[in-house]
Amino acid sequence: QKMIETKAPAFTELSEFASVSAGGKVVFATDDFFAPCEAMLADTEPIFITDKYTEFGKWMDGWETRRKRVTGHDWCILKLATKCVIRGLLLDTAFFTGNYAPKYSIQAACLTPEEDAQMPDRDGNRLGTSYNSCDLECVKQLDTDRWDEIVPVTPLRPGYDDTRLNYQKVVSDEAYTHIRVNIFPDGGIARLRVFGEAKAQAPPSDVMIDLVSLLSGATCQGYSNAHYGHPRNMIKPCKSETMADGWETARRLDRPDIIEANQDGTLKVPGEEWAVFKLGFPGKITQICVDTAHFKGNFPDSVKIEGAYLGYADWTPESKLVWQNILKPSKLSAHQDHWYDCTSDLVTHIRVTMAPDGGISRIRTYGYAVQPFLI
């Protein structure tokens, strides 16, 4: 059973796997005439520039195909950042008012590395083009039209402010690596987001990994403030491109009129902001990186990191636990990586606390996963 949502549903707090910064990418599209499919995965909010045109027509911030004058319908194949269970989607038609795709459906598959290697290479600017027969033949061999249907044919709404956001809950526990987005018959979509839970394969116990990475299956399970940017941005695998792609809080209203410092150099402030993450695997942390890239006039004064072991449980505000110190309050500076060696007990969760407020681009917690049968 599938449900259409009209307000931001709970699944939008989960990790996201289609956007460029998460590692999603387009591997095939039937048509990119007015606007290339890659723009649908952009991290930025869609914009509209009234007098901007290309040699092919009106510039649009999203994926837009030409008006169909041949049989069939348009579709594309996306590779997700990692294998995941899909819990919901957002299809944003912003500014596509007379040219949005009227209907869509979503199919999905879990491809082997060998099957993934059969996908065509998609390089260069595809604006003004359609598929070539060689690429289509590669995709046809994977029977994409027979993939699991996770969203049946469903109407889309036009890209006005009050109708642009089309949320779609998905009820399935299958894990997938690729999706096929069908639009009927043609038109445009500004942005696509895929929310869910990563299903990473446990690494060998002697291999160091980033335990809090999106690709390891880590998730954000709570936070105090996300006014300008969600804490889940910090666990994306790639370096951030802008300040918008990080965790940034509002300025705290309880900050002192005149700032003073503690003996260790950190500022005397009454408040702080926090975010809790469940690690991809239980593990022991040996090295931490806190990246303040792009945060130049709004980086936190200091950061501390604590850990806790909750077994298989998720963290909730009602969780009874004692947080153990992994990284004591440590000074931060603008627009750079901060590396710390550390030693932690076995932990399943971490709490990142900044004081008093500000922004952090990325956080990495390198260490070793502990297999469940060894716990």
Regions found by a protein language model. Give the residues of each.
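Juxtadomain low-complexity/linker regions and immediately adjacent membrane-anchoring helices
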Residues: 1-71, 87, 95-151, 157-162, ...
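Generic structural detector for well-ordered beta-strands
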Residues: 79, 169, 276-278, 341, ...
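C-terminal, well-structured subdomains that either form a transmembrane helix-short loop-helix hairpin
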Residues: 274-294
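Helix-boundary capping/turn motifs
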Residues: 78-84, 242-245, 278-283
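Short beta-strands within extracellular/lumenal beta-sheet-rich domains
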Residues: 69-80, 266-280
